[in-house]
C-alpha cells in the first residue's frame, strides 16, 4: 500500500493480508502523514499497553473486549470507538478470537489540549 497519496481508500482485506508480519507482528501500519499514524491490529491475546506520547483512537472493526483504563474496565464491541489520551496507562483485555481494530495515533506529543 502506498503511503504517499493525498487521498486513498485503505482496504481491510489488503491490510489484513500483511498480518502476521515477517517477525510475527500482529499489526501493520497502513498510513502515515505528519503526526498521524494508522495501523490495523489483530492482537491474539491481552495487550499490555505502554502509555503513548500521542492521543490514540481505536475503531473496533469486529469482535469484542474490555478496555482497562483509569482504574475502570469498560466492555466494547464491534462498531465502538475507544479514546485514550496521551500518557494514560491502558490495556485491552478479554478479546474475542475474531477481534480486529484500526489504531490511530495523532496530534502533538503530550496530546491535544482539551477544549
Language-model features, listed with the residues they occupy:
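Short secondary-structure boundary/capping segments
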Residues: 28-30, 49-50, 57, 73-74, ...
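Ligand-binding loop in jelly-roll beta-barrel domains
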Residues: 86-112
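Short strand-coil-strand connectors
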Residues: 32-34, 68-72, 95
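A short, N-terminal "cap"/entry segment at the start of jelly-roll beta-barrel domains
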Residues: 1-40, 45-49
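Short acidic-glycine-tyrosine-enriched beta hairpin
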Residues: 71-86
